[in-house]
Amino acid sequence: MAIRKYKPTTPGRRGSSVSDFAEITRSTPEKSLVRPLHGRGGRNAHGRITTRHKGGGHKRAYRLIDFRRNDKDGIPAKVAHIEYDPNRTANIALLHYADGEKRYIIAPKGLVQGSPVESGAGADIKPGNNLPLRNIPTGTTIHGVELRPGGGAKMARSAGASIQLLGKEGSYATLRMPSGEIRRVDVRCRASVGEVGNAEQSNINWGKAGRMRWKGKRPTVRGVVMNPVDHPHGGGEGKTSGGRHPVSPWGKPEGRTRKNKASDKMIVRRRRTGKNKR
């Protein structure tokens, strides 16, 4: 993909850019693979806000993506179209299988209309092909990796993301994640060859707040500019620093709040954070 820059005809257009969508070959999705998607505006079943800064945005339909691909082993397919998906940063590819079935997959870099695609232990090491990690050569760039065998692709699914297969030992494979983290997964887990396409998406300049609203993202307001009734940092005469250690709108101290997951024991080396990133 390439990025098209707008001329500064208005303040909102100045500096903004958009994808040229040159890779897209069809504008309407496959009707049999589309499901309705109802926006909840960040509310739960009680109508209370559980996720802030969400709401509005353009109406979307969900495209059913095949993240497992384990029931199509040995059945050849061909890429019929590369399509835009409003629900993710990556593009998607519509596959027509030899048995007549149609399915969507994440479109990797280099996959074009008419490309052959296959899955299974005997598949070639070509972009878009899906096979178990035990059958993928060391050093290969992959995406859409499972965390558990048969669980479906969980890692490296966004635009430009990729994972490197560093090695295999016994029943585990060692992977370098996009964040730099090194972790082990079962060699029976499946992955797709290549890196996810549409890598230039991260370089798009959205230009104005309105384009964020089209995506369903609402403003993020700082607590120190609120009133005391709305936030613990609110109130005070003139500009204040909040007068206390940073807390959430509900008074919980800012910082790490999540417990370790069971899968964390598979991490060999943590990703670099903070000053260690350099």
Curated annotation (Swiss-Prot):
Which SMART domains does the record match to this protein?
Ribosomal_L2 (SM01383), Ribosomal_L2_C (SM01382)
Which cysteines are cross-linked by disulfides? Answer: none
Tell me, what does this protein do in biology? One of the primary rRNA binding proteins. Required for association of the 30S and 50S subunits to form the 70S ribosome, for tRNA binding and peptide bond formation. It has been suggested to have peptidyltransferase activity; this is somewhat controversial. Makes several contacts with the 16S rRNA in the 70S ribosome.
Task: Return the Basic and acidic residues bias intervals.
Answer: 253-267
What are the GO cellular component annotations?
A: large ribosomal subunit
Which PROSITE patterns does the record match to this protein? RIBOSOMAL_L2 (PS00467)
Superkingdom of origin: Bacteria
Q: Per the UniProt entry, what are the Gene Ontology biological process annotations, in alphabetical order?
A: cytoplasmic translation
Species this protein is from: Rhodococcus erythropolis (strain PR4 / NBRC 100887)
Q: Which residues lie in Basic residues bias regions?
A: 37-58, 268-278
- Region listing for Disordered, in residue ranges: 1-58, 225-278
Which terms in the Gene Ontology molecular function aspect does this entry carry? Answer: rRNA binding; structural constituent of ribosome; transferase activity
Organism classification, top ranks? Bacteria, Bacillati, Actinomycetota, Actinomycetes, Mycobacteriales
Q: Kindly state which keywords UniProt assigns to this record, in alphabetical order.
A: Ribonucleoprotein, Ribosomal protein, RNA-binding, rRNA-binding
Q: Quaternary form?
A: Part of the 50S ribosomal subunit. Forms a bridge to the 30S subunit in the 70S ribosome.
UniProt similarity note: Belongs to the universal ribosomal protein uL2 family.
What protein am I looking at?
Large ribosomal subunit protein uL2
